[in-house]
Amino acid sequence: MNQTRVLLIFSWLTVATLLWMDWSKNKNETLEISASHNLGVDSNLELEHAVPQIHAGAVPLQKDSQLIAAAPKVPVINVTTDVLQLKLDGFSILAADLLRFPQSKDRGAKPIKLLTDDPNYPYSATTGWVSQSNSPVPNLSTFLPEQPDVSYKLANDQNRLVVPFIWTAANGVSIRRTFTFERGRYAILIRDEIRNSGETPWNAYVFRKLSRVPIPNILNRAMTNPDSFSFNGAVWYSEKGGYERRAFKDYMNDGGLNREIGGGWIALLQHHFFTAWIPQKDQASLYLLAQNGSRDIAELRGPAFTVAPGQTTTTEARLWVGPKLVEQITKEHVKGLDRVVDYSRFQLMALIGQGLFWILSHLNSLLHNWGWAIVGLVVLLRIAMYPLSASQYKSAAKMRKFQPRLQQLKERYGEDRQKFQQAMMELYKKEKINPMGGCFPILIQMPIFFALYWVLVESVELRQAPWLGWIQDLTTRDPYFILPLLNIVIMWATQKLTPTPAGMDPIAGKMMQVMPLIFGVMMAFVPSGLALYWVINGGLNLLIQWWMIRQHADFSRKRSRENIK
């Protein structure tokens, strides 16, 4: 095993990984639409506000056409904050535009539509009540705004905006629902206050649901679009199970989720953005995944409430509608919510990704440019790994010096590879050359390289972030292929400085010769930020290797002169 072989293995592993990711995406690109699924529920719970005994059909699922036909006309309220523009009624947020995130960098580009009332691809967040013991509950036609025909807008001197709805039953039970929006915040607090002014107990359970018809291009992308590999589907978190996820294409193939969880959350993820229901920590809910025609549904059912006459009770939850901004997500203080920035489903790789982003974000705060932050990250990593890299460069310099002697050994032993290997190892031992000296630094860089790929793909902070000149979005590929071409030149020059081991298999040698071209082609399809990292890293590696070879040559000449004297 030598440095060249390790580099060859690393190169092919990188290419194979990206090809596998592309193959797996294309293999399942057709959305599997199942028939309507209704899930049964375990009911052996003994919590104060326990998840209710819910049977299949408790919340009947209807076909999309039935939902549209059955939907009554209700007042729709428009709400505008500094970050969100929404349409909502008493039950659902029907549409949500992210005002700080345009769809493109074109002048006048419209904002990203995260939730939408598009009849072909609806995506909404809903919360309501299901009756138990024949208690009356609100529906779309009776849960009404306290101030109809009013549009709400967060004023410049306001930090909070409250939008109230009210429902009152004939038996004296009322529910006052408030949507609370805060300046600069994507988490919406939805609070229900149930007041029983009647004469009989009121029994019902709350449900909270995310429902969408996935847009086909979410599932039908290609390697030429780096965000092809971003996870799209449902994720949830629990103290016991940790972070779990299921892609839209596998929504029901792995069996319906049917689990009682307290202190968790559930979300629907897409590239750079997500929606999530975050219930109260002290209230358990039943977590469900279901499909209704073409709709994918993530739902929380429960807890159940019994409100005695003359009593009042409340329940609340946060609804996140927005980007995967690490700083804002952290401020919510919700355990595990940072995993929605899905660097990897594997905890170790996710931790490496989080660490890299932490360094990048601090460098960006100093340099005010994510591209230069990537350059700074490369420099810091090279400094941190220099003690390891130094042995690699020294080993390469020694190998270069003794290359003629190795060639002589090869000619001496001809086809007898066993004797040649023995003589070569004796030479290595005598001259204190470590043929494995270059392996460790390369192996260390492998997880960093893959983790950084996901950081650049997943970090919405880098979305549409420019570097300089032709690079105007670090999360998309280089439009003019300048960085891939530079990478080819740098790899070719590095190969010229690195001696080809004597006795190297001719096929492996030819593969190494074409490796710069293979890597260059690969870099043409990855985010330009990753190509920038690889070019800067390779350039620094080339300079340091050239300097080490020169230093070693000067040292050898000095020793030769001393020996002559």
Curated annotation (Swiss-Prot):
GO cellular component terms given for this protein: plasma membrane
Lineage top rank: taxon: Bacteria
Gene3D superfamilies: 2.70.98.90
Keywords: Cell inner membrane, Cell membrane, Chaperone, Membrane, Protein transport, Transmembrane, Transmembrane helix, Transport
Classification via Pfam families: 60KD_IMP, YidC_periplas
Subunit structure, interactors included: Interacts with the Sec translocase complex via SecD. Specifically interacts with transmembrane segments of nascent integral membrane proteins during membrane integration.
Family in the record: Belongs to the OXA1/ALB3/YidC family. Type 1 subfamily.
Protein name: Membrane protein insertase YidC
Source organism of the structure: Xylella fastidiosa (strain Temecula1 / ATCC 700964)
